[in-house]
Amino acid sequence: EGILTGMTRTTKRAEIVRAGLDCIAYQITDVVKAMSEESGIAIGELRVDGGPTKNKYLMQFQSDIADVSVQVPSAEELSGIGAAYAAGIAAGIYNREEVFGQMSRTKFSPKMDVSERNKKYQGWKAAVEQVLTD
C-alpha cells in the first residue's frame, strides 16, 4: 500500500518519479535513525553501493535528508568485492588500510537548511502515519 500526497492537476510525471526517489532516501533515513537510537552511536557517514548510486540527485538528497555524508565508490556493486576483501583481510593477505584507502569515492555532503530538512522529514512522517492509520 502506498500514498501520493500533494498532487494537483499540474503535477508532472517527473515530479512523481522524484517522489519515488525521495521515498528511497526517507526509508533509509528512518533505518539510520533507528540504528542510531538503538545503538546509541551517532552515524555521520553512509557508504553505499548498487544501482541507485548512479543517481546523483538521490545521493545528494540522501545526504541532505539524513544529515550525513554519503560516500559512493567508483565501483557500482561492491558486495562481491567486499566479501573477497574481507576474506583477504581475515587471511592476512590484505591489510584494512590498503584495501579501503585505495577505493576512490564521490562524497555527497549535506547542503539542505535544517528547517527545510525538518519540514520535509515531518511531511514524510505524516504521510507514513496516514498510510498506517487508514
Give the label of every model feature segment.
Residues 1-134:
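Glycine/Thr-rich phosphate-binding loops that ligate phosphate moieties of nucleotide
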